[in-house]
Amino acid sequence: MAALFTTPKRNDKTSGAHFVEPDVRRRTLLAHGSWRRVTRRIVVGAVCALTVSSLLMPSVSLAAEWVDVGGTQYNAGTAAGDAAGTWSWDGADDMKLNGYNGGAIEAAGKLNVSYEGNNTVTNDNGRGIKVKDGANENAELNIQGDASSTLNVTSSRDAITSVGNINIDGAGTVNATSTEHDAIDAGGDVTIKGSGNVNATGDSDGIRADGNITIDNSGTVTAKATEDQGIDANENLIIKGGGKVEASSIKDNAIWADGNIEISGGSQVKASSEEDAAIDGKNSLTVTNASLNASGVGYGIYVYKGITLDGATVTVRASSDGGEASALFTDEDDIVIKNGSTVDALAEGRFSVAISTSNFYSDEAGGHIYISDSVVKAIARYAETGGDGPDHYSGDQNDEIIPESEGLNIGIFAQTEKGITPATISIVRSKVTAEGDTAAIFALAMSADGKAIGTIEIEGSTILTPEGGKVIDYRNKEELSNGDIYEAGQTIGTGDAVIDSPYNEAVAKSTVIVPPEEIKPEEKPGETKPEGSKSEGTKTTKTVAAAATGAKTTGILAATGDTSSAAIVAAALAGTAAIAAGAVVSRKRS
């Protein structure tokens, strides 16, 4: 039997597709079940450094050195404004807008803009509001307005921009629109606070910062993009304050962060992309006591360094017409769902996983999924074709020699090779509903000696469906030109046999795992139970893999065979595990 999970090296010759050690950080499934290697995303971002000139810069005076309003420059030290009182500047750092309707505003140094009433800044051939470094002062732009006031900024280039930080505060509404570039762009950090609303619409990015983006706001922040990201943070993205954040992009990620993504404090975040992942991050994602709704193409959520959902409500959708789809995925780290979280993940594609993690590196500790005291629904299937229901590729498999393999779909999937510890899926006191056209739940470990075994552990919960369902073992061996690869893991299924194919009829395509309080066995007439007794269905179960030495499965390893039906589908499961791919390119900046 050919190995199910390995990808051959260039010089290997085998009848199947199988796993070997990947030599790149990011990988993807091929439509026919094998892997192609792609380079890991190289993020092009600003590198912050102190220059000699900044070290020698004299102490700042915290005031704009000059301002330019509608094409006329005014120097510091003298107050300025128009006769109608629609704008005024105190000659230092404070500017007031009250019914302003005019051209671009620019300043050197620090500028505080407060607005009242309805204000409009327009520039069809440049930036709207721009602050740059002065000769003796770094750029900083602060914008604030009251609840009944609006600031509209429309321009061809960046609408609101600063070489340094941008701070938006207050209860007013800021509408920033760029027809060719970013709506809001900072060379430093972007911070949005208060209770107001911010609507940023850019042809490039909606909201972008070379530093951190912090949204600590109880109002609504909307960031829309066409070519690039809705929200683009070259460092960390922090969302808190209990408000609503809606990010979207047509051609790119709705949300991208080169650092960590943290969502908390009752915030409600919605991210959607029409052509790419909804959320893409180079580090970790943490959602604590907040809600997140993400919908993307190829990926719903993809981050490299772990996902933690703590008291969170998360809905994720990923689709791909005939291709690869992964709803909730992390590479090289763990997925932790805990403390009353509710997670609903759906992936539709020829090769798809709803919740998945993978780890292929010996110095990394990831590749595990931990679910405790939570409710999780994970469904992976092939996209519907307009008929009565979705096409279930795995249902097309039969006992023919070398049948055509058309796809693979797994609800919850963990995979490791060379990791510090083997793949583990742990379910504790939780309700888990998992469905996959191929398998509902699968844990897989690969090694050169067969000692690493992927495990499924269930504690404080019971397998309700399928009837007679249990954790069953998977074993396979692939003989490659450079040595043998052993694949060992577990899945949910029926029977006592050790399987060597995910398409085995013993594998459960749908499973429901529930804590004791959700099991209500029928009471027989006249039956009484002693106080404190438990029904059979409420017994706590814990299942782990047997030790490699002396285990009942020792010696039951499928050998490579040219006529094996598993040979054609061999790499499909593997590819699904690292579905996290797609060639991600550097974002060019103007």
Language-model features: where?
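Ala/Thr-enriched low-complexity intrinsically disordered regions
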Residues: 6-7, 14-17, 28-31, 277, ...
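Sec-dependent signal peptide cleavage junction
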Residues: 56-66, 558-566, 586
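C-terminal low-complexity, Ser/Thr- and acidic/Pro-rich disordered "stalk" regions positioned immediately N-terminal
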Residues: 501-562
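Intrinsically disordered, low-complexity polyampholyte segments enriched for Lys and acidic residues
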Residues: 9-13, 21-23, 217, 289, ...
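A composition-driven surface/loop motif
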Residues: 5, 60-518
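Sec-dependent, cleavable N-terminal signal peptides
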Residues: 1-63, 590
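A cross-kingdom C-terminal cell-surface attachment/processing module
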Residues: 565-587
